[in-house]
Amino acid sequence: MIGKEETDQIMEVLKSGNISTFVASRGENFLGGKKIKEFEEKFSIKTGTKYAIAFNSATAALHAAVVAVGVQPGEEVVVPPYTFTSTATSSLMHNAIPVFSDVKRDIFCIDPSKLENVYSKLTRAIIPVHLFGHASDMDEIMAFAKKNNLRVIEDCAQSPGGQYKNKNLGTIGDCGVFSFQESKNVMTGEGGMLVTNDEDIANAAQMVRNHGEMIVSNKKRTYKSEILGWNYRMTELEAALGIAQISKLDFLNEERIKLADFMAKEINKIDGLRHVKYDYVKHVYYAFVFSFDEVKIGISRNVFCEALAAEGIPCSGGYVKPLYLNPLYLEKRAFAYRHYSGNVKYEKGICPISEILHEKEVILLEICRYPATLEDMQDIIDAIHKIIENKEELTKKSN
């Protein structure tokens, strides 16, 4: 949703000539320019956190988070396998080891009851993912983390504005990371944000973002790199887009929720289809996702999705292959594994729920968002009924 607000913000930056005012030297611009600071301030107010640090991607912000919470190379970070790749590779980028723990079959988020199975003396952090906009079970996750002295990084890439028991997602763990990639609820083209109430985490994240140096405004630059850092800096143009977009977050989320509520009500009337949302969660629907039972429906998920696409409704089955089934993990290609003293295993079968979700059950609809209407949602429901009513014919065609 791009309008006059975004255009005005972008033109202001272009006319100023300050496209990126980050510098790695003493002065206020070590922390970015005018638009960066304004975007960070607005986002910290929106989430209710003390600190918000803008990055050029959520991947970069996740990497910075792993560093900032104190994970050391060779230590382990527990992540779900049913998520975008960056949740896991952010650990490998720091030469730490991702350990995969299975998800819940109903909400697709990491299952707290499985955490004990993967915990080891090397475990240092957990990254729960609020997948598709639905919150993970944060009470149980935080209790496990507290018992074992672990840090918690919330992956909120798909859940800006979401809540768990009236708490903003990203504010429950030690820090939270958001994405502003073009497909997200609000976007800057590319971009990310780390939020936290911990000053030490904020300072470390700022160092990772800007070449590993910490520049104090009242001291001379020492050119001393305290930690390994990168150029993970957001531009003024992206921040300007973010300023305009963040003011629209509530409206855009409300539109998604309105459409998804209608879809959920209708989907759950059909035996063999199911959408789950916990009552104490504010789901912000990066995508509308439901489970498919091919035995009850009478056709395979692939046939169903192909038929839905033939009706003009884009959908996808499975989301992502569980990450550990990719060659990066199966063959332990990353440098981190060469100096790792643990015994993590990556092989088919270690997270069976994630595998069955990918192979048979999950269907995604990514069109339940503004400017779609309730009439559009009814068209989807009508198409689903049409497919089920004609499943015998579809079965013949697929054989």
Residue ranges of predicted features:
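Conserved PLP-binding active-site segment in aminotransferase class I/II-type PLP enzymes
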Residues: M1-A68, Q72, H94, K146, ...
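Generic structural signal for small/hydrophobic residues in well-ordered secondary structure
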Residues: I10, F43, A61, V77, ...
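Active-site region of PLP-dependent enzymes
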Residues: A24, L31, S159-K165, I172-A287
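PLP-dependent aminotransferase-like
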Residues: S25, V67-C156, Q163
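Structural detector of well-ordered beta-strand residues that form the stable sheet scaffold
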Residues: I53, V78, V99, V152-I153, ...
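Basic phosphate/pyrophosphate-binding loop/patch that engages nucleotide-derived ligands
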Residues: M142-R151, M193-H211, I299, V303-I313
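Conserved PLP cofactor-binding pocket of PLP-dependent enzymes
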Residues: G212-R221, F262, C305-I363, T395-N399
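Conserved small-domain helix->loop->beta segment predominantly found in fold-type I
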Residues: K220-W230, A264-P327, S398-N399
